């Protein structure tokens, strides 16, 4: 089953729901960054949550960046999602595995630690907008919900799931984001939350073949309306040309050292792990572009 996101609405048109399956997205991140179990769970949940947030809020060529800045062993987690539902991300420490909790689950809360959750949205305005809330749970889903409720005043419920196999590959990944629209009654919200609490573990459901459409009907009822279905993917827009532009910003003395001492340079993209090698001659060409500039 390919990765995709579904948007739906309940029969009263007062509850909006986004549901997603993202096994391949998280699997690609796991392979690119060689993630161990705890790191895979943290980055995976953040990737899924960021895609749900992008699906709910972005249009045109907008993008958002989620920074989960916890003091746990995984370290900061950075994810960027685009309006076309392409996502990329990384954790500072990819090789973290922790003792499981008593129920056998990965201790995501311990891996994340305490800190802040920041969401920066580039909506094509002069300045990006950043909202910030404390990490209240560390389980990540609750932290996204807290951000939406406190920073954006949108009453929300979020569920995120990543199942990591014993060999660190990804067995499943997915989740949901429920948002109450202004006309939603307390009774409607209460009834829907009861449905969510009655759900079996999302990981079990996705492993058993549940689709985003299935999850939407379980949460909103079988009479909900499916509005939209869109593919999602792990994708990075880095390139050798972009990194050459970064090299051009270095001082001439630094470029000369790379040429004369290192005889080349290799840069690695944090988001996707792609490596870009520059030969001496390529570095000389970059240095030549700077010759008309005043070097400080």
UniProtKB/Swiss-Prot annotation:
SUPFAM superfamilies: Hsp33 domain, HSP33 redox switch-like. Its main location: cytoplasm. Keywords: Chaperone, Cytoplasm, Disulfide bond, Redox-active center, Stress response, Zinc. GO terms for biological process: protein refolding. It is found in: Cytoplasm. Belongs to the HSP33 family. This is 33 kDa chaperonin.
